[in-house]
Design a protein with these regions (language model features):
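Membrane-proximal, proline-rich intrinsically disordered regions
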Residues: 19-74, 249-250, 525-538
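Short, surface-exposed recognition loops and adjoining beta-strand edges that mediate ligand/DNA contacts
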Residues: 32, 60-82, 174, 204-223, ...
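Glycine-rich, aromatic-lined ligand/substrate-binding cores of catalytic
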Residues: 55, 286, 290-294, 298-392, ...
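Long, intrinsically disordered, low-complexity segments
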Residues: 19-22, 117-120, 192-194, 215, ...
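Flexible, polar/acidic helix-loop-strand segments at domain edges
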Residues: 90-102, 351-431
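Conserved, well-structured interaction surfaces
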Residues: 34, 38-47, 51-61, 85-165, ...
Length: 538
């Protein structure tokens, strides 16, 4: 059905740079046998890295699983929450603390995210070492291209590490010793990522990574261009090494060297978004088609996690985690009755008014639930009716504790899914052109230009009236267009709203300094490496 490179897994990594990679697991094939020609070197030193983009393990994968990057970028924001439902979803206060920004350095899930990200970074360094030591078996072009792709993957994971933890170590050698690992400032990590991507982009294939074939699921030049646009858009944040003093550089005064020209952050973002347009990306006429069971031919999706329940173990948990038990049962499986959109989110979509956004029914399950045109009934004999406006962080005393909250939609239901709907055929969308248009609109407005063409192209696609291209409308449109796609935390930080009060969340003491915009360095890592210093106010 789907064509994707299969490979031999690379070895797992050291924790927080505390020990070396285990190069000799019992089931590992002879090193020379698996690196004895160019095809095997690519499969086992380059393609193997893509095993780590998705996952079926908690806190691993860029999206799809729970208690990881996606949850910290979504369930810490005004977009969504996992409310306590009587005896369900307390989990030691995990979800409530996440929503209230009450995490700390001993949070095991943050530690697991750090461990996951640096696992892939270290394995990438190992891959670069393997390519270099076997270059006698490769042509100069193969050596260049393999190296470029691995560096791009490594830059991708450094991007997520920097975005979450700010000051992280830059390690580019596989055989580095613990005492050599030092912490870099966030601005240094930012510059490293930008330099790496700009350096390798010309060597990356220009293919559309979301389409089936030899480049399916890989980091190609358009993926790098999207990431460079995202880095430029957030340059004010990422170049700020003292994020608790309330000051940051204006993007107009942050400069990049782009194709030999000096451009400010906003001009840089616009330039990379324009490259995506030139590379053939465009909006799909049908918004929902980007999230269909078979979405590999989308003209809009740029970078996806390939899912195929018959080939891969990668999972997509968010429909399963959100739907009521009976709702999942109607599809022949189960569900966990958890994640919901906040009241402010559904109100942003116009729920409860005569002007509901046309994307609402695609993105959410709300009101009376129908499956195959039939109502679903609860154990008490009443039909299942989700109540979007009855949501509270703690529903233990609510008559709506089982049904409060609009539930996760967006992705078409795969009626042949495995594992209670977690193993599906819908590829998980990480980057898409609709986001790039909104980035371009925002960059233009911040640069004193008119972003209305890009902003209203998004609204035209879903049959919504035009709005003025100002920052407030752009932030709202990003919620309407990108809900459930994992961008809300970054957006709120960039717009200065992440530490503000919102739905049933009161800011923490001293949170006005912005200290929660960066997560704490895990205590286990600080204990292992005394050269690492904690982020401010943790």
């Amino acid at each position: 059905m789907k064509t994707f490179i299969k490979y031999i897994l690379a070895a797992p990594l050291m924790l927080c740079f505390s020990s070396c990679l285990d190069e000799h697991p019992k089931d590992q094939l002879d090193q020379e046998a698996i690196y004895n020609n160019a095809d095997n070197i690519y499969k086992n030193a380059v393609a193997s890295l893509y095993n780590y983009i998705g996952s079926n393990q908690e806190s691993e994968g860029l999206q799809g699983t729970c208690r990881g990057i996606y949850d910290y970028n979504t369930l810490t924001t005004d977009e969504a929450m996992n409310p306590i439902r009587g005896g369900d979803w307390y989990d030691g206060g995990l979800w409530e603390n996440m929503y209230q920004h009450k995490w700390n350095a001993n949070d095991i899930n943050l530690y697991n995210v750090w461990k996951y990200l640096f696992k892939v970074i270290v394995i990438s360094n190992q891959s670069l070492s393997i390519i270099d030591s076997h270059k006698s078996l490769l042509s100069a072009e193969q050596t260049r291209d393999f190296t470029a792709e691995v560096r791009a993957v490594r830059a991708l994971f450094y991007y997520y590490a920097m975005d979450m933890f700010g000051r992280v170590p830059i390690v580019t050698s596989y055989d580095v010793k613990l005492e050599q690992v030092t912490q870099s400032e966030r601005s240094e990590v930012f510059k490293f990522i930008v330099d790496e991507l700009q350096d390798v982009a010309p060597q990356l294939a220009d293919e559309h990574s979301n389409k089936e074939g030899d480049y399916y699921g890989r980091v190609t030049r358009p993926v790098a261009n999207f990431l460079l646009a995202k880095l430029a858009l957030n340059a004010e944040i990422y170049t700020d090494d003292n994020w608790t003093n309330g000051k940051r550089q204006d993007g107009k005064n942050i400069y990049f060297n782009v194709n030999g020209e000096k451009k400010n952050a906003w001009e840089t973002c616009i330039w990379y978004c324009e490259q995506l347009r030139q590379e053939g990306y465009e909006l799909e006429s049908d918004y929902a088609s980007n999230f269909a069971v078979h979405n590999e031919n989308s003209k809009e999706n740029i970078f996806t996690i390939p899912l195929d329940k018959n080939l891969y173990l990668n999972e997509y948990h968010y429909l399963f985690r959100s739907r009521h038990y009976k709702h999942g049962g109607a599809y022949g499986g189960s569900s966990e009755n958890g994640t919901c959109a906040t009241v402010s989110t559904v109100k942003a979509f116009g729920y409860g008014t005569d002007h509901v956004d046309n994307r609402f029914k695609i993105n959410f399950y709300a009101d009376t639930v129908l499956v195959d045109g039939k109502k679903i009934y609860l154990d008490n004999g009443k039909p299942l009716v989700y109540m979007p406006l009855e949501l509270k962080l703690n529903l233990s005393d609510s008559p709506y504790k089982q049904t409060a909250g609009a539930r996760v939609g967006k992705y078409e239901v795969d009626r042949t899914a495995y594992s209670d709907g977690r193993q599906v055929d819908n590829d998980i969308v990480l980057f898409r052109y609709g986001d790039a248009l909104l980035m371009e609109a925002e960059a233009k407005v911040r640069n004193g230009e008119d972003g209305s063409i890009e902003l209203n192209a998004i609204r035209d696609r879903v049959g919504m009236p035009h709005v003025e291209a100002n920052l407030d409308n752009i932030l709202k449109e990003r919620l309407l267009e990108l809900v459930w796609e994992g961008w809300r935390r970054q957006d709120l930080i960039r717009f200065g709203k992440y530490t503000k009060a919102y739905d049933q969340r009161t800011p923490l003491e001293k949170e006005s300094t912005g200290f929660t915009t960066v997560f704490p360095i895990p205590q286990r890592c600080l204990d292992l490496n005394k050269k690492l210093k904690q982020n401010p106010s943790y």
